[in-house]
């Protein structure tokens, strides 16, 4: 379990950092994945130090989410400084963006094969260590940048997800990935 929260300006000081870090500790989270306007605790020196100390002492990594163009990672003010202070103990996360979620029955396939291909390339070619798995979209959804995500419809058959994960495992295992 990797707990996530969303930071908001004006509500992200020492108390918030302390409370969130307690949740990370409770679940022994292997990594910290930020979400929101700024890094956890960023509004106070003490809050920033609490996050740094937690990452150093727990051995948890800082999760860096890959941008949708796959060129860099999404960062917040203070990310580079945080990575420096924890000796670059970070991992790259592949986010299953809407256009990837929408690749069911795509390119001549009849199921999630192209989504599996995207996961495989992220792991093998771009060194992503975590896949941020999301629901698979039905093929006819509008995933343009201004699409209304509340209108999206999803594949709900568990067999599609099982196939996707088992096929990925089968492709990665001979290469030494577990």
Placement of each model-derived feature along the sequence:
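Soluble extramembrane regions of membrane proteins in the secretory/endomembrane system
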Residues: 1-178
């Amino acid at each position: 379990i990797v707990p996530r929260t969303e930071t908001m300006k004006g509500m992200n000081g020492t108390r918030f950092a302390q409370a969130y870090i307690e949740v990370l500790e409770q679940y022994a989270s292997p990594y910290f994945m930020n979400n929101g306007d700024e890094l956890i605790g960023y509004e106070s020196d003490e809050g920033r130090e609490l996050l740094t100390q937690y990452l150093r002492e727990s051995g948890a990594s800082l999760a860096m989410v890959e941008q949708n163009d796959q060129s860099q990672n999404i960062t917040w003010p203070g990310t580079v400084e945080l990575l420096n202070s924890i000796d670059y103990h970070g991992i790259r996360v592949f986010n299953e963006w809407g256009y990837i979620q929408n690749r069911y029955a795509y390119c001549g396939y009849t199921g999630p094969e192209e989504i599996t291909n995207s996961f495989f390339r992220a792991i093998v070619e771009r060194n992503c260590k975590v896949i941020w798995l999301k629901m698979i979209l039905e093929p006819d959804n509008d995933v343009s940048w201004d699409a209304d995500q509340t209108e999206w419809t999803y594949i709900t058959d568990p067999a599609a997800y099982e196939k996707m994960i088992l096929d990925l495992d089968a492709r990665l295992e001979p290469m030494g990935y577990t």
